[in-house]
Amino acid sequence: MIFTRERFKCHQGVMPIPCPHFKITIVKRSQGQSAVAGAAYQSGERLFSEYDQKTKFYNKKKELVHAEIMLPSHAPPGYADRATLWNAVEAVENQWNSQLARRIVLAFPVEVPKEQYLKMIREFCQEQFVAKGMIADFAIHDKGDGNPHAHILLTIRAMDEHGKWLPKARKDHDL
């Protein structure tokens, strides 16, 4: 199953279904944003930011269904820890106006059974991002109000085969 801006496709013979919401933004330090705070928000975890020495925690988030980090095979295993990953990202992006991460929010069509959400988002992240060397931190949220959705936080930099951050690509990724 592949999400795109317009729709996702089920490869088991189901007709393409429109994706009701798909938004991509950049987490920017110049706008007072933080990758650590974004990760804390979507995962519901309490995370300490080494950049501003503050704990980030959003205790009102009751709709978390699942949160997971997907790493390329050559990424350091320590990056499976959310605080370690996003603090490392914020350390390597050390300018006042750094772009820290890509944030994607997408809604699941109500026609799709809840049991398929995790499989769909894992396939999407693997094919579109992890296979290209990026790290994907995703969370599925569902309050039961008819708005099931996923948050994906992506590293801007990909990793090389030795687990080192590559320079920022001066090309558009095919998102």
Regions found by a protein language model. Give the residues of each.
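N-terminal nicking endonuclease/strand-transfer module with a His-rich metal-binding environment
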Residues: 1-175
